[in-house]
Amino acid sequence: MHCLPVLVILLLLIASTPSVDARPKTKDDVPPASFHGADDANRILQTLWNLRGCCEDKTCCFIG
């Protein structure tokens, strides 16, 4: 029972410490949300669908 207060204090100290990144950020670090890869992928897929003459709803497209 003597260890319980010590355990509680340690847990409170751990919870109150600020989170720190494992590695420092560099000027080249970009958050994933700022990438436009999904827009580019959609544009490329739309171009491929148009080249293959697929239906508008893409149900007749056979990718393979």
Swiss-Prot record:
Propeptide stretch(es), residue numbers: 23-52
Report the domain remarks.
Answer: The cysteine framework is V (CC-CC).
Organism of derivation: Conus tessulatus
Principal subcellular localisation of the protein: secreted
Query: Where would you find this protein in the cell?
Result: Secreted
Do you know which Pfam families this protein is assigned to?
Chi-conotoxin
Identification of the protein by name: Conotoxin Ts-011
User: Could you give a GO molecular-function term held by this entry?
Assistant: toxin activity
Superkingdom, natural source: Eukaryota
GO cellular component entries: extracellular region
Tissue expression notes:
Expressed by the venom duct.
* Family recorded in the similarity comment: Belongs to the conotoxin T superfamily.
Renumbered to this chain, the signal peptide range is 1-22
Describe PTMs of this protein.
Contains 2 disulfide bonds that can be either 'C1-C3, C2-C4' or 'C1-C4, C2-C3', since these disulfide connectivities have been observed for conotoxins with cysteine framework V (for examples, see AC P0DQQ7 and AC P81755).
* Isoleucine amide modification, residue list: 63
Record's InterPro entries? T-conotoxin (IPR031565)
Q: Tell me the keywords, alphabetical order.
A: Amidation, Disulfide bond, Neurotoxin, Secreted, Signal, Toxin
